[in-house]
Swiss-Prot record:
GO biological process entries: photosynthesis; photosystem II stabilization
InterPro entries on file: PSII_PsbZ, PSII_PsbZ_sf
HAMAP family: PSII_PsbZ
Topology with respect to the bilayer: Multi-pass membrane protein
Location of the protein in the cell: Plastid, Chloroplast thylakoid membrane
Domain of life of the organism encoding this protein: Eukaryota
Lineage: Eukaryota, Viridiplantae, Streptophyta, Embryophyta, Tracheophyta
Listed Gene3D superfamilies: Photosystem II PsbZ, reaction centre
Protein name per Swiss-Prot or TrEMBL: Photosystem II reaction center protein Z
Keyword Lyase: no
Keywords linked to the UniProt accession: Chloroplast, Membrane, Photosynthesis, Photosystem II, Plastid, Reaction center, Thylakoid, Transmembrane, Transmembrane helix
Family: Belongs to the PsbZ family.
Spans through the membrane: 8-28, 41-61
Length: 62
């Protein structure tokens, strides 16, 4: 169970880093938002899911 928690925290940190770097780049590019809107929303949905997963796993571990 601890391994799953650690991997989900690592995935959350990785997705957070990618969103922090990627979203401003997408918004700054001239045609970026209209062509990459689905990717940004998918990343945000994945991030929200990982936040809930980390919270659930944390409550099971401690």
């Amino acid at each position: 169970m601890t391994i799953a928690f650690e991997l989900s925290v690592f995935a959350l940190i990785t997705i957070s880093f990618l969103l922090v770097i990627g979203v401003p780049v997408v918004l700054a590019s001239p045609d970026g938002w209209s062509s990459s809107k689905n990717i940004v929303f998918s990343g945000a949905s994945l991030w929200i899911g990982l936040v809930f997963l980390v919270g659930i796993l944390n409550s099971l571990i401690s």
